[in-house]
Amino acid sequence: MHSIARILVVVLLMCCAASGSKAQSGNYDVFVPISKYITQGNADALSAWFSDNLDITVLSKGGNSSKVQAKQILHSFFSMHTPRSFEITYTAGRANMKYALGNLNAGGETYLVTIFVYCSDDKNQIQQFKIERVQ
């Protein structure tokens, strides 16, 4: 009887550890497609992740914009600054909000990109997107 209890405890601990590591590794999967679209300079695909209204700032210009306006702003930026690479350098977050910082090399310059994503059970939406020139 004592050995059955031990086995049960070990199995429960393994299940908890496995589910915890899965949750940890899955936390930032949302940034994989977002990163891909930034690297490609694909404002159309990236805008599919935008909330209906979001805060977008590109090179110190911007503010609260509709999804359509934000797409046009990024389209303009990507047409003048062709992306060469993008790498997420930092991620953080809570249960329903994820945050990422990344370095974008575009048009021969380096930019810091900040992304806030609201996460719910049925969808993930970018609520804030910012591109700043690195001095």
Functional labels for PLM-detected ranges:
Residues 110-135:
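Short beta-strand edge/turn micro-motifs at domain boundaries
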Residues 30, 34, 42, 69-74:
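Stable alpha-helical elements in mature extracytoplasmic
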Residues 27, 39, 63-67:
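Solvent-exposed, acidic/flexible segments
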Residues 72-110:
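Surface-exposed, charged secondary-structure patches
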Residues 42-53:
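Short, well-ordered alpha-helical segments enriched in acidic and aromatic residues
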Residues 2-36, 48:
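Short, low-complexity N-terminal intrinsically disordered segments enriched in polar/charged residues
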Residues 56-63:
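A short gly/proline-enriched turn/hairpin at secondary-structure junctions
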Residues 26-29, 44, 89-96, 134-135:
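Exposed acidic/polar residues on beta-strands and adjacent loops within beta-sheet cores, strongest
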